[in-house]
Amino acid sequence: MGLFSFTQEIAMDLGTANTIILNNDKIVVDEPSVVALDRRTDKMIAVGERAKLMYEKENPNIRTVRPLRDGVIADFNACEQMMRGLIKKVNTGRRLFTPSLRMVIGVPSGSTEVELRAVRDSAEHAGGRDVYLIFEPMAAAIGIGLDVEAPEGNMIVDIGGGSTEIAVISLGGIVSNNSIRIAGDDLTADIQEYMSRQHNVKVSERMAERIKIHVGAALTDLGEDAPEDYIVRGPNRITALPMEVPVCYQEIAHCLEKSIAKIETAILSALENTPPELYADIVSNGIYLAGGGALLRGLDKRLTDKINIPFHIAEDPLLSVAKGTGIALKNVDRFSFLMR
């Protein structure tokens, strides 16, 4: 863009765990949804990756905040500052003045009017002049490459950090949906609680996240895909002495069982509310998994065996919603399902 560009267009996947921003069809920001603030002035000190490095390590003068919880804004001021800081990271080149922003932002399909207003207000305070919202399952479907305006049913299960979005989409609309606040953060919390109860070792949220990445699983038998045990280091919760505990994927699969079962129940509930003709399409097409939770080892096989419908992991599940918001940004005049 040149010196006299009046409008800048960006698409944003505002996630509980990570925020992704697209500009000119390119991902220009992909950073943790964390902001560090000065406790005395509430001014931003760091955002994204730099702020995450401070998370759980801050001194009394700094507070690090994850502004979104369960997929929605929990701290309005922190969210506004985080959005503003991340938008500044977009490489916009030299300009004589700050352009107005046209934005498309992904939001959970179960959002209330108050929650939608909070996202819109945060975006406007961060510089947005023309703000559109898109439900995340719709964005994920577009990002996967599905024709959301076609007269056939497709089901999307988007397992993010704060919420799991389940939706049946047909003719450019969401026919039935189920949004539950069980997702990646809950799996991480399950691991923290399990390590404390079973192994007497205190682990941070960040360490629990590493355990999930290295040995997280939805099945107790992964066959040849089984990962090696992961060594967890942390203090004994009673004596505070350092410990080293090897953890295998089978025990993590057991500790995640209750949360995964809740996701299964939510999917079955959405299927129960699906009209028969669209249900037949879903059985034929399969169900698409998106979001970071789609990467949990064995989840697609477990769901396929449980529900008896094929589950397909999106080609790039972490970026499905972001890609979809980017495509929606180029079609704001065509996509009637965008919300202003």
What residue spans do the PLM features occupy?
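Nucleotide/phosphate-binding catalytic cleft detector across ATP-hydrolyzing
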Residues: 1-159, 167-287, 294-340
